[in-house]
Amino acid sequence: VRVYFDTGVFIDYLSTRGSANALLRSSERRGRAPADIAADAERLFEKVGRIHIGATSCLTYYEVEEALYRLLAQSAKGISRAETLLIPAARSITTQVQIVVELFNISVLDLTPGTVRLQLQQLDLQTRGIRAADALHAATAIAFDAELLVSADDAILNLDGILVNTQGRKIVCRDTDLALQLL
């Protein structure tokens, strides 16, 4: 099975691996505690890495760092030079994503003009209000011929059965716990 991972799955996995990362997943999602969410992400990465084909977009690197930076910056308001000093802390999660990619044999797909064109051709993404980053992830999953798109994002999950890969197959969109049941 060709499995595409949205950024949220990496955040799920890394949220229990570092004190700053824990800020990214501090509340329940769909009745699951952050520790359970992280465990589901780990099991999914392991399973896909062993017997399936996994991929994500290079956009994931930007999104994880920016998400952590925003949270750290909120807590450092009013502190001189905080923005500069927070960059190394936020950048560390990008390094961690690279390690996850290597540990679980996940391909990192380029964001190309073709990906942007594909995004622009997907009228459903526009009419359903799917914003730029999510739309680029959806287009990348389509181009990858994903059969399963795993996401923590409701906007992406609501695209279940709507996205069609280049082979003409509908893409199933699931959160980590339900993706594990499918695989």
Description of each model-found segment:
Residues 1-2, 17-33, 126, 138-183:
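Acidic, PIN/NYN-like endoribonuclease modules and their adjacent C-terminal/linker elements
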Residues 1-60, 68-81, 177-179:
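Short, well-structured N-terminal submotif of metal-dependent ribonuclease cores
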Residues 9-10, 48, 56, 83-122, ...:
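Anionic, Ser/Thr-rich low-complexity intrinsically disordered regions
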Residues 35-38, 91, 131:
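Short alpha-helix boundary/capping motifs
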Residues 39-42, 94, 135:
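Residue-level marker for well-ordered alpha-helical positions
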Residues 45, 98, 138:
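Short glycine-/small-residue-rich flexible loop motifs, especially phosphate/cofactor-binding loops
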Residues 102-154, 158:
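Active-site neighborhoods of divalent-metal-dependent phosphate/nucleic-acid chemistry enzymes
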